[in-house]
Amino acid sequence: MATSLGSNTYNRQNWEDADFPILCQTCLGENPYIRMTKEKYGKECKICARPFTVFRWCPGVRMRFKKTEVCQTCSKLKNVCQTCLLDLEYGLPIQVRDAGLSFKDDMPKSDVNKEYYTQNMEREISNSDGTRPVGMLGKATSTSDMLLKLARTTPYYKRNRPHICSFWVKGECKRGEECPYRHEKPTDPDDPLADQNIKDRYYGINDPVADKLLKRASTMPRLDPPEDKTITTLYVGGLGDTITETDLRNHFYQFGEIRTITVVQRQQCAFIQFATRQAAEVAAEKSFNKLIVNGRRLNVKWGRSQAARGKEKEKDGTTDSGIKLEPVPGLPGALPPPPAAEEEASANYFNLPPSGPPAVVNIALPPPPGIAPPPPPGFGPHMFHPMGPPPPFMRAPGPIHYPSQDPQRMGAHAGKHSSP
């Protein structure tokens, strides 16, 4: 198609002339006082190849100049920014948004079909108020939980930084701090994020950024319904003391008929039983990881049947295939009972024998005057039984091999010996 302003082509009346671009907050920049240049029919759109009005501006200090890449018609068809081609509502690539909304917009890619499709869409846009997307995206009214979790609504201004200086990478940059490009090490060329195509992002195919986000979404926790279709009970945890049965009923009644609500105040949880399985599945899907009642986030899970809980008790120590597992050898047994108060007071940290009074030594004293001494041993009858070993509390303490093992030297009884 000829792009000369003087040529009279059949599509000349469809050239775009706009007064302000359609941009996201990140591309626009953080500076509210921005200077922007406008050039009518400055370039052709990279999607529909029609001339359009190009806007160019600098989003901030030490940032690179940015400009619009696609026309406003292509931007309105996909509800994306004219520069970065990210969704204006969620800040996500088109491929992620379409996957979250569960629809695929098959736009024509050949020249003739693309022009015909664009003209029809422009007519539809002119008949609308211009604030809502048209086409397949305008018909998708339902929102997705995945999009709400992955949404990037906070501006990320580092995306506007200059590109890496190729001369600095080769060691030949002589500008120093005056160089408008970044002096940083480039990313790995084998990294998928290093190869991005604007057309692939617009059509939602082979987008490496979208693939990374979709992989992250696949690893998010999910609440799968149990295989037992008779389970219609949901477990709600983390109630606290402020949430009552009425608060739970006011939230869950919208999903279907509620049979019973049992609140266990001691455990701060509740069990909500629905009349039908479908109502329980809808309630679990709409409430998992996003239920907030009275400013408190609650935990929602599926309840378990009594039969399943009984099987778990029976299968204790048994694998799924029915093999009985032996206990692991070498594990320590039960811990001994705690020491008594007297033993704690003694502070016997090294299992030393308790210290007591010195052992009594049987020393023969001279008999008083006027009394005959006893006969020597072996010549007379035994008057007394020989003494046995002294009791434990009378035994002398065992030898201490190292001074550090003596609790008396380690300050265990410092309070007793310290002067008042």
Swiss-Prot record:
It is found in: Nucleus; Cytoplasm. A zinc finger (C3H1-type) spans 159-186. Residues 303-343, 372-420 are annotated as: Disordered. The modification N6-acetyllysine is found at K212. Residues 232-305 form the RRM domain. The gene is RBM22. The modification N-acetylalanine is found at A2. GO terms for molecular function: calcium-dependent protein binding; pre-mRNA binding; RNA binding; U6 snRNA binding; zinc ion binding. Changing K324R: Accumulates in speckle-like structures. The modification Phosphoserine is found at S4, S102. Residues 309-318 have a biased composition (Basic and acidic residues). This is Pre-mRNA-splicing factor RBM22. Component of the pre-catalytic and catalytic spliceosome complexes. Component of the postcatalytic spliceosome P complex. Interacts with PDCD6; the interaction induces translocation of PDCD6 in the cytoplasm. Interacts with PPIL1. It holds the Pfam family STL11_N. Belongs to the SLT11 family. Gene3D superfamilies: 3.30.70.330, Zinc finger, CCCH-type. Required for pre-mRNA splicing as component of the activated spliceosome. Involved in the first step of pre-mRNA splicing. Binds directly to the internal stem-loop (ISL) domain of the U6 snRNA and to the pre-mRNA intron near the 5' splice site during the activation and catalytic phases of the spliceosome cycle. Involved in both translocations of the nuclear SLU7 to the cytoplasm and the cytosolic calcium-binding protein PDCD6 to the nucleus upon cellular stress responses. There is a cross-link at K139, K149, K290 (Glycyl lysine isopeptide (Lys-Gly) (interchain with G-Cter in SUMO2)). One of its GO terms (cellular component) is catalytic step 2 spliceosome. It comes from the Eukaryota. Keywords: Acetylation, Cytoplasm, Isopeptide bond, Metal-binding, mRNA processing, mRNA splicing, Nucleus, Phosphoprotein, RNA-binding, Spliceosome, Transport, Ubl conjugation, Zinc, Zinc-finger. GO terms for biological process: cellular response to xenobiotic stimulus; mRNA cis splicing, via spliceosome; mRNA splicing, via spliceosome; positive regulation of protein export from nucleus; positive regulation of protein import into nucleus; positive regulation of RNA splicing.
